[in-house]
């Protein structure tokens, strides 16, 4: 009998301990979650895009997709065909304040969860877009505008969500506008080649969008960011804008152009784009990575090195020579064109999405947009080739 009683007492004690542990866990975890949410709400710079309803932000888009039903569901509004004209709109997005880089668990569906919810989409006429966008620009502390161009395989709904996520994590008090081109041409080799052709053709509509922004919205500071094959859209847009005497002469119209993991052919970038870039952009930053597996596949398909692919390693002289080849378009001591290797900090799953998943990248990007000079940070190191061409390496620090 004492043995049974002792067993019952032990069982009761263990049960009480388990309940106490569970209670403490829920208490502290709940408190931690509440503190994180309160902190996220307290420390947020995005004010100009914020709507009166807490946690809802307004962004804008221009697209050259063929409209299907612009008043229908999100998935059914635009197709994957290119139109030689533009459609405009605004999208109001609810963003949970605790959403962060560490929450990228499943890249195939994380944008569809409750952290980023598209609450309202409106089609805008050109004049209304200019009016609403200009109002945000004039209310922003920098009188700035960030334009975003996404890359290969991006559908319209995910392009909207990724733009909202980018604005949230970058957290600059600036209006944000998406240029959405039909990059969703399929995942096969044929789809990739078809998307590359569409990207080249879409340069015309991006050029028209940039001209609209520069002439009518008139931000003091215009920032243009393109990822992956979106870089090809930018290159072809610059080809078109450069033919206009107003854009070909000084001063430059774009303060900062940023290309991340750019899927752009080196020869085209070096030959034509170099002079066009000087005329149109005051600063150009190209983020590259040697472990960008997606671009290695692109290289095999295109039988040439793509712009986003790097082999930088300061401990390896042969790789330094390859870096010099990549930097052929740079002039000695050139500070307008900056090459940044993110290999040491690129921890992403397919090594191609560092522009959405790497904290050090966002820290560096924030400084490049908000500062007027080249940033100097503890994580950023610069190297120089024997020909005095400078490039940068972004590290995790010490």
What are these regions (language model features)?
Residues 150, 227, 352-353:
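Histidine-centered active-site/metal-ligand motif
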Residues 206, 226, 230, 234:
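Gly/Ala-rich beta-loop-alpha elbow adjacent to hydrolase catalytic centers
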Residues 143-144:
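Alpha/beta-hydrolase fold active-site loops
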Residues 147-151, 261:
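The conserved beta1-alpha1 loop
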């Amino acid at each position: 009998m004492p043995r049974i009683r002792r067993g019952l007492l032990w069982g009761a004690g263990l049960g009480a301990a388990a309940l106490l542990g569970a209670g403490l866990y829920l208490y502290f975890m709940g408190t931690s979650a509440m503190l994180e949410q309160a902190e996220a709400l307290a420390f947020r710079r995005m004010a100009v895009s914020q709507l009166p309803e807490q946690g809802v932000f307004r962004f804008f888009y221009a697209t050259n997709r063929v409209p299907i039903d612009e008043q229908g569901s999100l998935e059914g509004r635009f197709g994957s065909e290119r139109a030689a004209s533009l459609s405009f709109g605004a999208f109001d997005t609810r963003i949970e304040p605790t959403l962060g880089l560490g929450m990228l668990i499943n890249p195939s569906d994380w944008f569809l969860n409750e952290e980023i919810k598209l609450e309202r989409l409106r089609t805008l006429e050109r004049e209304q877009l200019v009016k609403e966008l200009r109002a945000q620009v004039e209310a922003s502390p920098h009188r700035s505008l960030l334009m975003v161009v996404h890359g290969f395989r991006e559908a319209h709904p995910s392009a909207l969500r990724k733009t909202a996520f980018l604005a949230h994590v970058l957290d600059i008090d600036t209006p944000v506008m998406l240029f959405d081109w039909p990059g969703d041409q399929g995942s096969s080799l044929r789809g990739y080649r078809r998307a590359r052709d569409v990207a080249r053709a879409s340069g015309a509509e991006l050029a028209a969008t940039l001209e609209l922004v520069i002439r009518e919205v008139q931000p003091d500071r215009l920032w243009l960011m393109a990822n992956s094959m979106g870089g090809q859209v930018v290159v072809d847009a610059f080809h078109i804008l450069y033919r206009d005497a107003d854009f070909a002469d000084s001063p430059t119209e774009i303060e900062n152009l940023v290309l991340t993991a750019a899927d752009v052919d080196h020869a085209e970038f070096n030959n034509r784009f170099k002079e066009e870039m000087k005329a149109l952009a005051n600063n150009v930053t190209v983020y590259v990575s040697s472990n960008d597996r997606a671009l290695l596949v692109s290289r095999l398909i295109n039988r040439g090195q793509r712009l986003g692919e790097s082999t930088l390693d300061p401990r390896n002289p042969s790789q330094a020579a390859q870096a010099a080849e990549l930097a052929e378009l740079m002039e000695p001591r050139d500070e307008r064109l900056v090459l940044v290797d993110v290999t040491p900090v690129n921890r992403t799953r397919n090594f191609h999405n560092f522009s959405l998943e790497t904290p050090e990248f966002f820290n560096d990007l924030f400084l490049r947009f908000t500062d007027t000079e080249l940033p100097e940070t503890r994580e950023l190191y610069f190297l120089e080739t024997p020909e005095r061409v400078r490039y940068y390496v972004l590290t995790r620090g010490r």
